[in-house]
Amino acid sequence: MVTTSVRPASRPLNFWACLGIPAVAAIILVLLELTSLDMDLARLFYDPVAGQFIGRHSYLLEDILHDRAKQVVIGFSVFAILGFTGAFFIDRLKPFKRELGCLVLSLALATSFVTPMKAVTAVQCPWSLEQFGGHETYSELLSPRPATDKPGRCWPGGHAATGFTLFALFFALRDRRPRLARQAFVFAFALGTVFSVSRMMQGAHFFSHNVWTAIFCWMICLGAYYYILYRPGSEVEAAGKAEAVGA
C-alpha cells in the first residue's frame, strides 16, 4: 500500500454507471409496485400448513445470520473508528486519515438512516399481514397506510443495510488498492444479498425492501466518497505544484 502523504489521484469515476444504475433500479422498483412480485416471492417462503414462514424460528437464520453476523459488522465498525482515531496519533496511519474518516462516516450514515425511515414510512412486515397469518392490511409503498394501532417498521431493510453498508469499504480502498476494492464490493454485495434472503425467509421483509436498502447504502457511500476522497488527476497535479513551490 502506498504510504505517501499526498493521496493518489482518484481513479476515473463513471457517474452514469454509479448514478444511472441505481436510478434505473429505483424506477423499476416503483413500477414493480403495480405487480404482485413481492407477494409472490414471499409466498415461496410461507408454509400455510404451519401458518408461518419457513425460517421464522430458524437458529441459523436468527441466531447466526442475524444476531451474530450483526455483531461482527458492529465489531468491524468499532475497529474502523479506532483506526480513524489512531490516524491522528500513529504515524503509519496518518496518510490514511481521510480514507478511514470516509469509511467511518459512510458506515454511520448507511446504518443510521434506516430507523427514522422506518418510522416515517410505517410499512408492514410480511409476517404481520393477513395473507401470512397476521392481522395487518397490505399497502403499496407509495399508498396511504391503513389505520392501525401497530404501525409497521419494515422499510427499508435494517439487516440488509448491515451488509450493504460495507460498500463503504469499496470506496475507502478504491484509489489506493483497486483490486482489493473490487473484492470488497463483491463481498459487500454478497453479504447484503445473503442477509436479505435470510430475512425474506423469515417473513421480515419483501424483496423490494432489500433492493431499496442496497440503493440507499450505495448512494450514501458514493456521496461520502465523492465529497471526502474523490480527487481528479488535475487536482492532484495542482496540489503537487503547490507543494513544489512551497518547498
Would you name each region that the model predicts?
Residues 15-16, 21, 138-247:
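Membrane-embedded catalytic cores of phosphoryl/pyrophosphoryl-handling enzymes
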Residues 31, 78-85, 113, 117, ...:
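Alpha-helical membrane-inserting segments
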Residues 84-120, 181, 185:
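Interfacial segments of alpha-helical transmembrane regions
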Residues 37, 89-96, 119-127, 204, ...:
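Transmembrane helix-loop junctions in multipass membrane proteins, especially transporters and channels
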Residues 2-80, 118-126, 135-136, 246:
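N-terminal transmembrane-helix/juxtamembrane module of multi-pass inner/ER membrane proteins
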Residues 71-91, 159-175:
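Transmembrane alpha-helical segments in integral membrane proteins
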Residues 22-26, 76, 103-112, 214, ...:
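Alpha-helical transmembrane spans of integral membrane proteins, capturing the lipid-embedded, hydrophobic core
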Residues 27-30, 110-115, 190-200:
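Aromatic-anchored segments of alpha-helical transmembrane domains
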